[in-house]
Every structure is written in structure tokens, then in C-alpha cells.
């Protein structure tokens, strides 16, 4: 019987290029520039090559993701990881472009999946979404079926289309996202602070982001509000950024 392997060994190889794409609608979104500055600082510190586009239309959101995918697949050097940061007004499942038209998030996620981006197959793809997902506001609270048989193979020759992806939303489904008109968004500023000052795999870092946001109290129009991010992961290994 072979000795069990430590989970610490199961981590993504980050020796290749690290790439990031930032798409941000600044129109009628005061505080966006502070978020952009913070993200640029974070990506420099984490040794990412970052590309930024301000005020994309709905169509340009899709076009920029496709251009990013093509640039990744055409690189001669190996790519280890890709980040995509999307910041705009929105509602559940959609972002609003600078032109007021909507683009479906699901379509944006398609560009870098294991089927459409060969260079990122089995590589981590992280999406950071700073946008409202509804109209609700959280005031805070005081503190069987049929059996399914699963067969595991030691050396799989194929992987699912949507593995190795991490979607991080600034708020939970149905709720608005908060942004200060001078200091930027609570979510982006907290994420940058944790990612640049703390070490650990990315899900540990995001747990710390969630803790800080959940414990913070926001005030909007004189009323106390609470908020926390939502994390959806299909990562198969640990992802360390530093």
C-alpha cells in the first residue's frame, strides 16, 4: 500500500507567465480609479503582466476577453495563471457596458475555459467581479436521495471543460455591491490588502477577505449595511500567488 501524499504537494505550478486583464467601466462609478490603482499595485507585486481597458462597451467586454485568449494561446512561453477583473454596474448574471447594453457573464467565462483556451488548459483562471447582482440590501443579523457511484482514475486523460476556475463576486446573488466615491469599493480594497500583505493559498486569502468584509459595517444613507463576497471554485489544486 502506497503512502498517502500530503495535500501540500497538490499545488499549481506558478513558474510560468502570470497574466491579468482588467476591464472597468468608470462612467458613473466614482471611486473606480482608486480600485484601478490598487489592482495595478497588487499585480505588480505579485509579478503579473497586466492589461487594462477603461469604459468598454458590452460588445468590447466580449472582444477584449477573446483578444486576451488569443494572446495567451499565441505566446511561446508557458503561462501559469490568468486573472480577469471585471468592474461595472450589473445585475445577476450580467454586466452593463459603457454604452448601457448588457453582456452575459457566462459568455465572458467561456473564453478561457479548458476547451477554448489551450494554453490555460488545467491552469488556474481567476475571475474577480465587482458589480451588483441585484437590488437587495443586507442590514445584518444578530449574531437523502439515490446513491451515486463515483469512479476515480489515477491518471485521467481528460478533464472537464470548466475545471481550474475561480469566480469571486463582490456580493452574493440578489444583492447590491458597495463602492465609496473617494476610497473605492470595499471588496477590491480589502482583496488587494489581503493579497499583498498575507501569504497562503488563494482560498485561505479569500476566507480572510470574507471575514474582514463580514465584520465591517457600511453606512449608506444613514443606515447600517452588511456585505460579503461569494466564492465559486472548481480549482483542483492549491493556488499560491507568493
Curated annotation (Swiss-Prot):
What molecular function terms (GO) are annotated for this protein?
cysteine-type endopeptidase activity
User: What tissues has this protein been observed in?
Assistant: Expressed in keratinocytes of adult skin suprabasal layers (from spinous layers to the stratum granulosum and stratum corneum) (at protein level). Expressed in keratinocytes of hair shaft and sebaceous glands (at protein level). In psoriatic skin only expressed at very low levels. The p17/10 mature form is expressed in epidermis stratum corneum, the p20/p8 intermediate form in epidermis upper granular cells of the stratum granulosum.
According to the UniProt entry, how is activity regulated?
A: Inhibited by caspase-1 inhibitor YVAD-FMK and the pan-caspase inhibitor VAD-FMK.
Q: Which keywords describe this protein according to UniProt?
A: Cytoplasm, Differentiation, Hydrolase, Ichthyosis, Nucleus, Protease, Thiol protease, Zymogen
What role does it play?
A: Non-apoptotic caspase involved in epidermal differentiation. Is the predominant caspase in epidermal stratum corneum. Seems to play a role in keratinocyte differentiation and is required for cornification. Regulates maturation of the epidermis by proteolytically processing filaggrin. In vitro has a preference for the substrate [WY]-X-X-D motif and is active on the synthetic caspase substrate WEHD-ACF. Involved in processing of prosaposin in the epidermis. May be involved in retinal pigment epithelium cell barrier function.
Family as reported in the entry's similarity comment:
Belongs to the peptidase C14A family.
Q: Which CDD domains match?
A: CASc
Q: Kindly indicate whether the keyword Nucleus belongs to this entry.
A: yes
Other remarks on record?
Expressed in bacteria requires high concentrations of kosmotropic salts to be activated. The mature and the intermediate form differ in activity towards synthetic caspase substrates: the p17/p10 mature form but not the p20/p8 intermediate form is active on WEHD-MCA; p20/p8 is active on a number of other caspase substrates without any marked preference (VEID-AFC, DEVD-AFC, LEVD-AFC and LEHD-AFC).
This chain's protein is named Caspase-14
The keyword Protease is annotated on this UniProt entry: yes
Localization per Swiss-Prot or TrEMBL: Cytoplasm; Nucleus
> Per its UniProt record, what Gene3D superfamilies does this chain match?
3.40.50.1460
What switches on expression, per the entry, is described as: In undifferentiated keratinocytes under postconfluency growth conditions (in vitro). By high glucose in retinal pigment epithelia cells.
Q: Subunit structure, per the record?
A: Heterodimer of a large and a small subunit, both processed from the precursor; the mature active form is a p17/p10 dimer and the intermediate form a p20/p8 dimer.
Q: How is it modified after translation?
A: Maturation by proteolytic processing appears to be a two-step process. The precursor is processed by KLK7 to yield the p20/p8 intermediate form which acts on the precursor to yield the p17/p10 mature form. Initially, cleavage between Ile-152 and Lys-153 has been proposed to yield the large and small subunits of the active enzyme.
Q: Which disease is it linked to?
A: Ichthyosis, congenital, autosomal recessive 12: A form of autosomal recessive congenital ichthyosis, a disorder of keratinization with abnormal differentiation and desquamation of the epidermis, resulting in abnormal skin scaling over the whole body. The main skin phenotypes are lamellar ichthyosis (LI) and non-bullous congenital ichthyosiform erythroderma (NCIE), although phenotypic overlap within the same patient or among patients from the same family can occur.
Active site (catalytic residues): 89, 132
**EC number(s) for this protein?**
3.4.22.-
Its cellular-component GO annotations read: cornified envelope; cytoplasm; cytosol; keratin filament; mitochondrion; nucleoplasm; nucleus
Q: Which Pfam families match?
A: Peptidase_C14 (PF00656)
Any one GO biological process = keratinization
